[in-house]
Amino acid sequence: MRILITGGLGFIGSHLVNSLGKQHVIDIVDGFDENYVGYKFIHRGSKGLQETNDIEKKHRKLNLHYRVNKVRGMYRHFFKTNSYVQLPLKEYDLIINCGALSEAILSQHFPEFTHDSIVKGLESLKKFYPKTPVLHISSSMVYGTWEGVIDEQYSLGSENHYGLSKIKAETLCGEKDVILRPIHIYGMGDGKFSIWMNIDRQIAISKPVLVERAGCIYIDDFVIAIKKIIDSWNPGTYNISYNF
């Protein structure tokens, strides 16, 4: 199968490239550089937007190196661009759309980039490849906040640019597409708020090491789920997590 993966150098995308590249012909669209807002900046609560410190830079570089090695030799063509800017003039059997801002907290500081990367990116894909089914990575943030267990019929609503953009993007998907709403994916290659980076930061300032408890799914299990979806394609919208 010929598969285009947007955001193929990102956390989720790189793991998908590594796994699917063993069986399928993979192309990557990814415009990443070190000026990417999620790589360069961090939100520090009341302090607002700041550039990453030395510890955060170290972990981002380590995880970038991990992802680069993860995709090496597993794809056919790499197109260094964003999906809302340019797309390859080729035909594909499937598109997996991972290419967008992944740091929801930063959407308040970069609303235009949030909309472009999430909404305009998918608009471009749907216009450029109208007959190709899309596996779209959305987010549980389309639900806003909730208590208890929810299903896919739970009402949508969000108070931030990220969640609202994800809701808008979902409306662009059609009857042949699959939408996934993961709650939190963790694992190697995640350079944002990885558990080991948070531990490193707490130790550096002599504070207790605290690990937040939340519903989540390990990246390898998420990839397995996507492979099963591809093998048994059933269009629709699905929540995905361990405790969802």
Specify the residue positions occupied by each region the protein language model found.
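N-terminal Rossmann/SDR dinucleotide-binding element
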Residues: 1-94
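Rossmann-fold scaffold of SDR-type NAD(P)-dependent oxidoreductases
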Residues: 6, 93-98, 136-137, 239
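Conserved Rossmann-fold NAD(P)-dependent oxidoreductase catalytic core, especially the SDR/UDP-sugar
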Residues: 97, 123-159, 178
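Short alpha-helical oligomerization interface
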Residues: 104-121, 151-158
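Conserved internal alpha-helix within the Rossmann fold of NAD(P)-dependent oxidoreductases
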Residues: 121-125, 170, 226
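NAD(P)-dependent short-chain dehydrogenase/reductase
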Residues: 148, 159, 171-223, 227
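Active-site helix of classical SDR
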Residues: 161, 165
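Mid/C-terminal beta-alpha module of Rossmann-like enzyme folds, strongest
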Residues: 225-244
